[in-house]
Amino acid sequence: MATGTEPHLNSGGVRTGTRAAITAPHLRTDRWWLAPAVTAAGLLAFIVYSTWRAFANADYYAAPYVSPFYSPCLAENCETMRAGPNWDLFGSWWGISPAIIILIFPLGFRLTCYYYRKAYYRGFWMSPPACAVAEPHKKYSGETRFPLILQNIHRYFFYAALLVAGILTYDTVLAFRDENYEWGHMGLGTLVFLANIALIWAYTLSCHSCRHIVGGKLKHFSKHPVRYRMWQWIGKLNARHMQLAWASLVSVALADFYVYLVASGVFDDPRFF
């Protein structure tokens, strides 16, 4: 170091010879802890809610709406959904909630997402808790060891997320029916589903892996004008990846909650026509 001194080692933070020789864990005077605390609270709230709904195995279908947590329904014990996404692929041996089957894929996509990794690394593991704030861990291995090395399968979860988004789009189209499965109708739930699927697609396509797949390997953009234009569009979405991550997380929970309220008889779906 320029001062010829070594940093003072203590029990907090990863300390190496490249760090400033200060004894304080950080010099920030703002409320740096607020962002990771709010992030942790928001993620924890969603985890609690989604766990309850996934294992409830009830009140997830109110014609013509099916909860995004249960779509597609791949077990024999699914509620009958006329022309809906109830495809009996797992048979009768699957005895618990069918939501557990499908939620693996959207949750896997979000858990390995670059933004969510930053969010829960900071919010739950404090690794690091904030910029210019030393983390409390003595060692750092990054994502080179199990289980964090599994984060590298994010690109494959992206393809699964595309399939799930396609199925949810199908569910949204079915939402233009009434409770008697007649087409040409629209209710408040239809608007809820439209908002949700728009945010789901925006979040999915704003993914860093999507941006790389579209234009990351191109050496000459001039030779691929269509992919270059798509790469630019996705880049604009990518700049809002954090906002879209939270907005879509809230929207999918609200869509499920709306179906729950209608299916459990709290109120009837208001119909516009």
Which sequence ranges carry the predicted segments?
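Membrane-embedded alpha-helical bundles that constitute the cytochrome b-like, heme-associated redox core
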Residues: 2-273
